């Protein structure tokens, strides 16, 4: 069933460049001057789905906004600088995307980013909860396994929590899985769809190759190697960039893909499915990524995990302790805030 619903990976991105799409979304990017924020803002500006694009950061946003505003697409772009301008940036937004935070450097795990990024995400989440609680919130800032629980707890503190509208963007894991499977099988990656469930770090990233469309088969040793490559693909990029950052361009692409899918669903398009790290009852973890049917109000239905072989079952049970610890770390962090 999942395979039937899940559309080819890049359909949303391709459609965003067509002229027939509905096109009134007001999108805010918080952290718009950074390595992910700039290319993400470019992709959003290039889409006819977006009518207004507001960019926030603590530096350089007027310049980024001025640069993007010269592009001959209809999205109106405005930059906002510093905390006092954040409420205006959020005003009337339908979708808020948060790539803000520091990137990984060689030798760092996503969890090493926790201390810096937890504070940044909590601060931005509080502003969203106060000034635009109705918006869809898409968190890119790592570690997503902790920053989503942080966002949820901050929204609870403000009495405006809606679990159907807070998304951890794990789309890059799906994009990578699609690409790597396509490479191995000589397929068009735009026609491959691999659900990736669990979390968004190391062994919590669980690609369900058994549910890939089209159906693919690998011998166990190749399957193990492929799974490992998907799980460590972020580290592959960090190493290749040799200290000059982490995955920014592919992450911007994946973030845009998720936003376009969400906006399509908000516009009433049916059958839009994306995986995302959200509040969940699918496993004993309180947050878990699975394929979600998206709708006008966010998550319409959690499609769950479905039938999987023992190899994938074991990956889930191996991931749960680490995932629980990351979730607890995020929740505990919010308890320390005033």
Curated annotation (Swiss-Prot):
<keyword id="KW-0007">Acetylation</keyword>
<feature type="modified residue" description="N6-succinyllysine; alternate">
    <location>
        <position position="185"/>
    </location>
</feature>
<dbReference type="InterPro" id="IPR015955">
    <property type="entry name" value="Lactate_DH/Glyco_Ohase_4_C"/>
</dbReference>
<dbReference type="GO" id="GO:0030060">
    <property type="term" value="F:L-malate dehydrogenase (NAD+) activity"/>
</dbReference>
<feature type="modified residue" description="N6-acetyllysine; alternate">
    <location>
        <position position="314"/>
    </location>
</feature>
<dbReference type="Pfam" id="PF02866">
    <property type="entry name" value="Ldh_1_C"/>
</dbReference>
<dbReference type="GO" id="GO:0006108">
    <property type="term" value="P:malate metabolic process"/>
</dbReference>
<feature type="modified residue" description="N6-acetyllysine; alternate">
    <location>
        <position position="78"/>
    </location>
</feature>
<feature type="glycosylation site" description="O-linked (GlcNAc) serine">
    <location>
        <position position="33"/>
    </location>
</feature>
<dbReference type="GO" id="GO:0042803">
    <property type="term" value="F:protein homodimerization activity"/>
</dbReference>
<feature type="modified residue" description="N6-acetyllysine; alternate">
    <location>
        <position position="215"/>
    </location>
</feature>
<feature type="modified residue" description="N6-malonyllysine; alternate">
    <location>
        <position position="239"/>
    </location>
</feature>
<feature type="modified residue" description="N6-succinyllysine; alternate">
    <location>
        <position position="215"/>
    </location>
</feature>
<feature type="modified residue" description="N6-acetyllysine">
    <location>
        <position position="165"/>
    </location>
</feature>
<feature type="binding site">
    <location>
        <begin position="31"/>
        <end position="37"/>
    </location>
    <ligand>
        <name>NAD(+)</name>
    </ligand>
</feature>
<feature type="modified residue" description="N6-acetyllysine; alternate">
    <location>
        <position position="328"/>
    </location>
</feature>
<feature type="binding site">
    <location>
        <position position="251"/>
    </location>
    <ligand>
        <name>NAD(+)</name>
    </ligand>
</feature>
<feature type="modified residue" description="N6-succinyllysine; alternate">
    <location>
        <position position="335"/>
    </location>
</feature>
<feature type="transit peptide" description="Mitochondrion">
    <location>
        <begin position="1"/>
        <end position="24"/>
    </location>
</feature>
<feature type="modified residue" description="N6-succinyllysine; alternate">
    <location>
        <position position="78"/>
    </location>
</feature>
<feature type="modified residue" description="N6-succinyllysine; alternate">
    <location>
        <position position="91"/>
    </location>
</feature>
<dbReference type="InterPro" id="IPR036291">
    <property type="entry name" value="NAD(P)-bd_dom_sf"/>
</dbReference>
<feature type="modified residue" description="N6-acetyllysine; alternate">
    <location>
        <position position="185"/>
    </location>
</feature>
<feature type="modified residue" description="N6-succinyllysine; alternate">
    <location>
        <position position="324"/>
    </location>
</feature>
<feature type="modified residue" description="N6-acetyllysine; alternate">
    <location>
        <position position="301"/>
    </location>
</feature>
<feature type="modified residue" description="N6-acetyllysine; alternate">
    <location>
        <position position="329"/>
    </location>
</feature>
<dbReference type="GO" id="GO:0005759">
    <property type="term" value="C:mitochondrial matrix"/>
</dbReference>
<dbReference type="Pfam" id="PF00056">
    <property type="entry name" value="Ldh_1_N"/>
</dbReference>
<dbReference type="InterPro" id="IPR010097">
    <property type="entry name" value="Malate_DH_type1"/>
</dbReference>
<feature type="modified residue" description="N6-acetyllysine; alternate">
    <location>
        <position position="335"/>
    </location>
</feature>
<feature type="modified residue" description="N6-succinyllysine; alternate">
    <location>
        <position position="301"/>
    </location>
</feature>
<feature type="binding site">
    <location>
        <begin position="140"/>
        <end position="142"/>
    </location>
    <ligand>
        <name>NAD(+)</name>
    </ligand>
</feature>
<feature type="binding site">
    <location>
        <position position="117"/>
    </location>
    <ligand>
        <name>NAD(+)</name>
    </ligand>
</feature>
<dbReference type="InterPro" id="IPR001557">
    <property type="entry name" value="L-lactate/malate_DH"/>
</dbReference>
<keyword id="KW-0809">Transit peptide</keyword>
<feature type="modified residue" description="Phosphoserine">
    <location>
        <position position="326"/>
    </location>
</feature>
<feature type="modified residue" description="N6-acetyllysine; alternate">
    <location>
        <position position="91"/>
    </location>
</feature>
<dbReference type="GO" id="GO:0006099">
    <property type="term" value="P:tricarboxylic acid cycle"/>
</dbReference>
<dbReference type="GO" id="GO:0006734">
    <property type="term" value="P:NADH metabolic process"/>
</dbReference>
<feature type="active site" description="Proton acceptor">
    <location>
        <position position="200"/>
    </location>
</feature>
<feature type="modified residue" description="N6-succinyllysine; alternate">
    <location>
        <position position="239"/>
    </location>
</feature>
<keyword id="KW-0597">Phosphoprotein</keyword>
């Amino acid at each position: 069933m999942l395979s039937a619903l899940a559309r080819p990976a890049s359909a949303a991105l391709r459609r965003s460049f067509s002229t027939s799409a509905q096109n009134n979304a007001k999108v805010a990017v918080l952290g718009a001057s950074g390595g992910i924020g700039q290319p993400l803002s470019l992709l959003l500006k290039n889409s006819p789905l977006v009518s207004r694009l507001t960019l926030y950061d603590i530096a350089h946003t007027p310049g980024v906004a001025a640069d993007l505003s010269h592009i001959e697409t209809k999205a109106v772009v405005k930059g906002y600088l510093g905390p006092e301008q954040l409420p205006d940036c959020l005003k009337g937004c339908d979708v808020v995307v948060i790539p803000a935070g520091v990137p990984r450097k060689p030798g760092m795990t996503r969890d090493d980013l926790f201390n810096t990024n937890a504070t940044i995400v909590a601060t931005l989440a509080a502003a969203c909860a106060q000034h635009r609680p109705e918006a869809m919130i898409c968190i890119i800032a790592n570690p997503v396994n902790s920053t989503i629980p942080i966002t949820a707890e901050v929204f609870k503190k403000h009495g405006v929590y809606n679990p159907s509208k807070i998304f951890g963007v794990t789309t890059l894991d799906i994009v990578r899985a699609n690409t790597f499977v396509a490479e191995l099988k000589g397929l068009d990656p735009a026609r491959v769809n691999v659900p990736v469930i669990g979390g968004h770090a190391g062994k919590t990233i669980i690609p369900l190759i058994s549910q890939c469309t089209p159906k693919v088969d690998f011998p166990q040793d190749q399957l193990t190697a492929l799974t490992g490559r998907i799980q460590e693909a972020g580290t592959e990029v960090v190493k290749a960039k040799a200290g000059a950052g982490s995955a920014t361009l592919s992450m911007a692409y994946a973030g845009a893909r998720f936003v376009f899918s969400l906006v399509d669903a908000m516009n009433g398009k049916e059958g839009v499915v994306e995986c995302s790290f959200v509040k969940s009852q699918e496993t004993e973890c309180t947050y878990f990524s699975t394929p979600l049917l998206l709708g006008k109000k966010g998550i319409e239905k959690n499609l769950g995990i479905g039938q999987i072989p023992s190899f994938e079952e074991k990956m889930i049970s191996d991931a749960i302790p680490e995932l629980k610890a990351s979730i607890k770390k995020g929740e505990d962090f919010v308890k320390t805030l005033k």
